[in-house]
Swiss-Prot record:
Function: Plays an important role in the de novo pathway of purine nucleotide biosynthesis. Catalyzes the first committed step in the biosynthesis of AMP from IMP.
Gene name linked to the record: purA
Species annotation: Verminephrobacter eiseniae (strain EF01-2)
UniProt-annotated catalytic positions: 18 (proton acceptor), 46 (proton donor)
EC number from the UniProt entry: 6.3.4.4
Positions that bind IMP: 18-21, 43-46, 137, 151, 247, 262, 330
Protein name listed in UniProt: Adenylosuccinate synthetase
Length: 458
């Protein structure tokens, strides 16, 4: 197909992440020439399956797997240079050209080893104090965003000025080592193998961190860019851009199940702020949602099933869907589709259309349940309340629909789906009020049903 020129699409997750955004971004880049990451860090994980080969990405936009597509890391991303180069080297070993196609905003805050140390120590302190863990990945994302908001972060651009970088690094280390040792008790904490080289007596050591940062600085310089300017110039030249969200709406720091959320805004509106373009450049918002729900880590999950019990629908979802986190390897909790939560996601993102992924995972279930609202304090509500405390008290209200025994794996024609699968999808559209434009029927990029293409949709 020939896409409309100068049209830009935003892809966002509508659940708690892990919806299959990577595959759809990869599929959509046949119509785009640039892909942009605008928030998060290497806590996000995208798995692509191309010709049967799996590739896991954490920082680099999924468009890197399409030859000739330019990839951008916007200012809204917190960047671990160490993890970035691990990813680059892995792709290069697989024959993928990265460095000439990757542009990194000079305004990206840096994730440094002390951020990960604080992240891990805080979660350990919560557990030791009897509180439920937030469920962070322990990769320093939250502490790095804290430094950004407190206006003390070291940014990519600082790497171009070694003396300034060193002075500010010393200041940051004094602050964060004080937090680690006096408040979090890091002197008695056993850090993992990845952090041990940086830490002595519970303190992160300046010399090791500084030397590594200076090595990364030389490697990063050719990729540093004014990403905002380049994206605006690309748009004026009629280039199609794709903005790739990480995690999901229900993990958004403002609109998610607070405090069990990430530290950035995962919603579509942040595609503008997190990359340096105006909101008028965002033409279509595609919401990605699984045909059921999953969640990694702590926090409320109204439709959660006994997914660890063999023979149950939740166990079927976990097993057939291979529900383990790309970044952490943790098992994902599984449950029925929550259309009420999706309505909230549609509201805060302004969704133009939906892509339903992993429809094939539901093959073989005799019946399906669809949450259309909740009961809270004796009243029926059709949207989730704000905040985890009230969501925990919500009881889901379900509709039961018949399942299907036929296989949907690899189907690329909507008319060839089982009748009950089509009814299930139609009911999701009716309850949420958002049209389904795409359906994924396996992890393979080509196993996609298209009803309306985001780059052609009006």
């Amino acid at each position: 197909m020939t896409a409309t020129k100068g049209r830009n699409v935003v892809v966002v997750g509508t659940q708690w992440g892990d919806e299959g955004k990577g595959k759809l971004v990869d599929w959509l880049t046949q119509s785009a020439q640039g892909v942009v990451r605008f928030q998060g860090g290497h806590n996000a994980g995208h798995t692509l399956v191309i010709n049967g080969v799996k590739t896991a990405l954490h920082l680099i936009p999924s468009g890197i797997m399409r030859p000739g597509v330019k990839c951008y890391i916007g200012n809204g991303v917190v960047l671990s240079a160490a993890k970035l180069f691990e990813e680059i080297e892995g792709l290069e070993k697989a024959g993928v050209e990265v460095r000439s196609r990757l542009r990194i905003s000079e305004a990206c805050p840096l994730i440094l080893p002390f951020h990960a140390a604080i992240d891990i120590a805080r979660e350990a302190a919560r557990e030791q104090g009897g509180a439920e863990k937030i469920g962070t990945t322990g990769r320093g994302i939250g502490p790095a965003y804290e430094d950004k908001i407190a206006r003390r972060a070291l940014r990519v651009q600082d790497l171009k000025h070694p003396e300034r970088f060193a002075a500010r690094l010393r200041e940051l280390l004094d602050l964060h080592n004080h937090l680690l040792t006096t408040y979090l008790g890091s002197a008695t904490f056993v850090f993992d193998a990845a952090l041990k080289p940086y830490i002595e007596a519970g303190k992160v050591q300046f010399d090791v961190v500084h030397a590594e940062a200076m090595r990364h600085a030389e490697l990063l310089k050719p990729m540093m860019a004014d990403v905002s300017r380049e994206l605006n110039e690309a748009h004026r030249a009629g280039i199609n851009l794709l903005f790739e969200g990480a995690q999901g709406t229900l993990l958004d720091v403002d609109h998610g199940t607070y405090p069990y959320v990430t530290s950035s805004n995962c919603v579509a509106g942040n595609a503008a702020a997190g990359s340096g373009v105006g909101p008028g450049m965002l033409h279509y918002i595609l919401g990605i949602t699984k045909a059921y729900c999953t969640r990694v880590g702590g926090g409320p999950f109204p439709t959660e099933l006994d997914w660890q019990v063999p023979g149950t629908p939740g166990y079927h979802m976990s097993l057939v869907g291979a529900e383990k986190g790309v970044t952490t390897g943790r098992s994902r909790r599984c449950g029925w589709f929550d259309a009420a939560l999706l309505k909230r996601s549609a509201q805060v993102n302004g969704l133009s259309g939906l892509c339903i992924t992993k429809l094939d995972v539901l093959d073989g279930l005799a019946e399906l349940r669809l949450c259309t609202g909740y009961e809270l304090d004796g009243a029926r509500i059709d949207l989730p309340p704000m905040g985890a405390e009230d969501i925990i008290r919500c009881r889901p209200i379900y509709e039961t629909l018949p399942g299907w025994s036929e296989s949907t794996v690899g189907v690329t024609d909507y008319a060839k789906l089982p009748q009950n699968a089509r009814r299930y999808l139609e009911r999701i559209e009716q309850v949420t009020g958002v049209p389904i434009d795409l359906i994924s029927t396996s992890p393979d990029r080509d196993h996609t049903i298209m009803m309306r293409h985001p780059y052609d949709a009006g």
